[in-house]
Amino acid sequence: MRSIFLAATALSTLSSATFANTNAAVATDSNSAPDIITVIGLNGDPDAIPGSADMLTAEDLSIHDYADVTRILRAVAGVNIQEEDGYGLRPNIGMRGTGVDRSDKITLMEDGVLISPAPYSAPAAYYFPHSGRMAGVEVIKGAAGVRYGPRTQGGSLNLLSTPVPEETAGFMSLWLGDENTQRGHAYFGGMTDIDDGVRFGGLLEGYFDSADGFKTIDGFEDQSTGYEIEDYVGKLRFEIDGDFADQSFELKLQYSDELSNVTYLGLTDSDFAADPFRRYSASQLDQMDAEHSEQSLRYQAVFNNDVVLSAVAYSTEFSRDWFKLDRIDPDGAGAGGASSISSILANPGGNAAAFEIIQGAAGFVSVDDAVLIKHNNRDYLAQGVQFELAGELDMAGASHMWRVGLRIHEDEMDRFQWREHFRMDNGTLVRTRNDVPGSESNRIDSAEAVAFFIQDEIVFDQWTFTPGLRFEQIDLMREDFGKLDTDRTGANLVVKTNSVDAFIPGFGIRYDVNSEISLFGGVHRGFAPPAPGSTTQDTEDATNWEFGARYAADFWHVEAIGFFNAYENLIGTCTNSTGGGCVIGDQFDGGEVDVSGVELTGNMDLGKMFDLPFSMPLRGAYTYTHAEFQTDFNSGFGPWGNVSTGDELPYIPEHQLFAAIGIDAGHFGGEIAVSWVDEVRTSAGQGALDPTTSVEGHTVTDASAWYAVTDNVRARVSVRNLTDEVYAVARRPAGVRPGSPRAVLFGLSVDF
């Protein structure tokens, strides 16, 4: 399938600039009418929101044509990112100090639909939509975000898929380069008139991305440490213009699969210094095998009285088995005496026998059953229906744009996991026995939720007020069948339940000083529900404030925002990726936490400023974040441990900076982008950073350029990590892990 796809892609490819223009004509009868696909709207203005909002259009995304969403989001102030695998396969994203692990503290959506595998019961984003096929990215923070949930502490991230074009159009692109990278993206579709006032059309889209990886496994130098991804989307759209209402129906089907040879096993400090792209031989079999599908049916009616009814029924399924190194048992006596790879890499000297097995040097042979590799096998299901009614009216001298929404949702995660046992034999893993499937973890976590919101944007003279209220009613359940009842007879079934009712108010305000300057602020409740089976019955709660100012002129735009989030209770969630030494899925109270910060964003066109014959865009984003605990406590959550008042949260950099300058001369263009991330703690603490529990700051430069061969054909080049900076990105869950090295990609795009 891969060779067929690449051959087809090589025939013709659509330029990203044309794609951006196509995107401007989103296939909808509603024109600027409100809808539930977007937060801001492809034609919307983030500045019109009384709060913090950012919109990255298809034109923005085309500059570097990133396949890694973490590189895309470096350009957005207030977004915290912890790199992991170098490709953004399972990104760690937070906002305003929420924590970043598996993006489980923010609300993730695609086309306005919750897209985490199980958004309520298991939100850790082991699936993330592939950004290489997206037409836009929306980020919203602050009080306006109460429209979205269930997580409102930091903000929402909404990825916009390719819309059905208004007219017949096609797009194909191909990239080839270092690490044997092969990436293709193609779509074809459009709308056609089939009767007076009736239109029908659709879209077929395919996306492929693969690379051999930049790490080398000891003894297996030719083995891929990269990935292969395929992603397919189909849409059918039907539009009817009527006397009473203009209506549209859209069916969306999506399927993707991933096979990636990635690991949680990092390196010791000394081995990282010697060769940061080395992988110990015990990780030779680590592999993620995953499939995802999405089905949705949308309906929208724009009535003559300017009222818009939107509805979507949706279902997502995600299955994955991450077969990866779990524990080491030097004497082979049984899993009870085995050590986790996190504890071994944290103290290799004190775990010399286990670390020797991990290294698997030539001439070394372990006992049988010394290496335990786990099938981290999970199936997820999420489904629901959501409605939104929106409209505009004038009343008492003010203009109102009101919205009312309802979502009925259910999701679940089915964990059915087991281990295989191996002997390390001269650097090669030899299987010695298998455990019974389900004998390591055997449970179902589920949630049922009803959410309601109401929001009104009131415009009076130069003032805009946006009060809003969200209500979440959530029932959570964990059904633990136990490790002995692998047939799930229920003989040892333990059921835990929890219910949460939450009112989430928010209020935003904007004052337009004149046509160029506006001031804004807001306050809202930050909320996140507990997990099924949590050790805490408490929700995550905060009171979040923001104040800011914007200035927009003909050729430049600047924005400054200050924020303060006062957590009454911060929750930490145990995942494999935290290396926390706890039961996966359990949650821990962190008590009171204060997060304060500043976000600065600016962009200008130096070409317009100096009346040059070409465009020269300059853009930048700076984030300052300070997050610290306000109480003393001892936690069973590894990244926290023994906490003292004033301890800073892990993996939240104090400073982040992004800057880019480009050129667009019509027939050629390009950009150089630089991002700098401050040093971070890898566990809670204060004072001078300990090199063994921190990651140094780093600067990464990316560059891209394009040349218009014809009006429809572009030749492109993109360089990741131009200076070949060697840097660490994390110490969790098991040892130091590197960022991606320099890679050069060459591309061709054609539109038709």
Language-model features, listed with the residues they occupy:
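Transmembrane beta-barrel wall of Gram-negative outer-membrane proteins
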Residues: A169-F171, L176-S210, K215-N261, Q287-E291, ...
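Signature of Gram-negative outer-membrane beta-barrel scaffolds
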Residues: L372, S399-N514, S534, S644
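Outer-membrane beta-barrel domain signature, strongest for Gram-negative TonB-dependent receptors
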Residues: T225-W402, L406, A552, H557-E559
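Gram-negative outer-membrane beta-barrel transporters
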Residues: T22, V26, A390, M395-G397, ...
